[in-house]
């Protein structure tokens, strides 16, 4: 494969992509059944009988919905009571004639018409805690489906975007992100295009800053700067209130840090200096998560879960690639955590994913090409509580 294809915005690479896209479209659209298949798929995607997929936040259920009347989609919410009452079957097994009562928050078709932009939905983060819980959200929108998007803060009480002039959080178009940084909604974690030298070769921002309302990105404290040749830098605050910083040296590896509350950070003035350096710069108070760079580590409750892509020998025990292991987070950070194997692959079964509920860890497995779920109930190390 020619090296010039690695140039994400290179004219030669983009021309090559356009040429091959056109050839592929011609081949696919020229088949005899193309129109029939497209019509059948559109009917399925636009069906009103679909079960709305919901996400819970601050006591409400949120859903993004598209259909023939709303091709770009509606972002809406409802209550548990309304959603359950209109389910296919009630608890007693009887059919329900009720209809879920949805509150439309954003109509992307209307928004696009009013602003003259074809907005494509890239997701939203509802504030889950504090006095503004369920009343503010950070919404990501892409112009025409581009990889780049913008973030805008919306007042969910009024459905109105809060302009920066009124203190609303806002991010210009980039492959970056904004994420809530505290319980009150007064600060955000900002990963933004800050101009020359701030983007990686892959086009992702290299720097994470924490901003207060009214601050520009240049004024925010610096939490992390990825190395010049890394894929980029990322940050998020989990539902237990912990702040995580991440770099990806390449597509297959990552480095992870926990930033404790009140930990020392770097002043705004260090930003340009850090961007000019070749190596990674991280806040002095951040704690590195010492796992293989090929692994994926995440914290659930007060446990650290580590998904392995390569064999890992710890304390004389080798955990094979494909395993999911865990340790109490506090003990692991102190160098004392003994790893527990939660899942070890076999000749027929491997782990495809996992998710945490309020009290259980649900593993999704594929065993002899058959999906299966396994529910684990780990002991708790402490009183860490999640947000809904």
Question: Can you say where each PLM-predicted feature lies in the sequence?
Answer:
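Short mixed-charge
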Residues: 82-98
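Peripheral, non-catalytic segments that deliver or gate enzyme domains
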Residues: 2-32, 37-42, 47-60, 64-82, ...
